[in-house]
């Protein structure tokens, strides 16, 4: 899991992570290549982001890490969902997910 968190920190430093309302705007504009949500995200917000990603055909992984891990990795507070804009960071993240580096939480 540490490799995934390191990649997220690097992507954050490179300003390739999007969160908050900007995330929804960029999903609509097809700028987001991948969305990650935390294990402890609220049900209504999770449904909203899942529906948006499904409609605009954006890949999403739910519950890979928790809020504390994500916030420490990216250096921000109270972030529950992030979008990755850069395809190279997406490839690194998917590589870490596929090699079993991540403990999967409950996905919806």
Please give the residue ranges for each predicted region.
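Short active-site oxyanion
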Residues: 15, 32-34, 57-59, 79-80
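C-terminal structural segments of small proteins and small subunits
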Residues: 71-108
């Amino acid at each position: 899991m540490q490799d995934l968190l390191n990649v997220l920190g690097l992507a954050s430093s490179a300003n390739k992570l999007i969160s908050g309302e900007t995330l929804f705007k960029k999903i609509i504009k097809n700028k987001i290549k991948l969305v990650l949500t935390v294990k402890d995200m609220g049900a209504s917000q999770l449904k909203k982001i899942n529906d948006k990603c499904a409609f605009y055909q954006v890949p999403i992984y739910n519950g890979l890490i928790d809020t504390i891990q994500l916030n420490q990795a990216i250096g921000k507070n109270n972030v529950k969902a992030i979008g990755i804009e850069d395809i190279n960071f997406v490839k690194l993240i998917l590589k870490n997910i596929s090699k079993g580096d991540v403990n999967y939480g409950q996905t919806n």
